[in-house]
Amino acid sequence: MYEQTLYSVISPIKQSTISRLNKSKKWSYGYNKEHDIVVISKTGQIGEIYNIQNFKIALPKQPKKINKTTDKWTVEEYPKELKQIKSVFDWRDYPDNFKEKWEPYIDEQFKRREEGHWFNNRGMATYITGTHYMYLQWSKIDVGKPDFREANRLFFIFWEACKADVRSYGMCYLKNRRSGFSFMASGEVVNLATINSDSRYGILSKSGADAKTMFTDKVVPISVNYPFFFKPIQDGMDRPKTEL
């Protein structure tokens, strides 16, 4: 029987220490020098600690309640009432009772984007990072919506740790073809560019033409198909050729 070897769950910290600091929500996002782990949790609490390529990564603590209506990842249907809204300006024109109805839904989407999301996968509570959630739930790719892949989940967890660790300059990722990396990278570019002000995010490829194709065929469609509450106010065309 196959046993995965991409990661292992380790216990480098006493459970009593984890519980004590969880109670006061003292675990800070980033590298923890005292325990030599990288915390990717943004809730102040941690749960399992993964060892990926000798990189010790502390995940968020598993919540007590996880939706168990499905046994695998499923994309949540975007409410029809919100599909009609194209920009924040349209949203402002709606009555207050409409906004009050949908604000909890929108707040939850922002929370998942920031903290990540737990779901039931073959009977197991499974965590995905906020970036991975944005890719699976809100990114449009050539076949529609991306599939959930365990290898991608680990990739995004490792990538989140690289972003969290002040010692890190990034990651080197050796990939095979047709792994979905171009779409994952495009999704991350859009995700980061739409939550950080006064920042520039570029695309590097083996040629300028290939970089432009990635922008027009992958980055722009993902951006265009974001729901209105994730779209920043922008000037110019919806489908530009060189920059958003």
Predicted features, each with a name:
Residues 1-244:
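Phosphate/NTP-binding elements of NTP-utilizing enzymes
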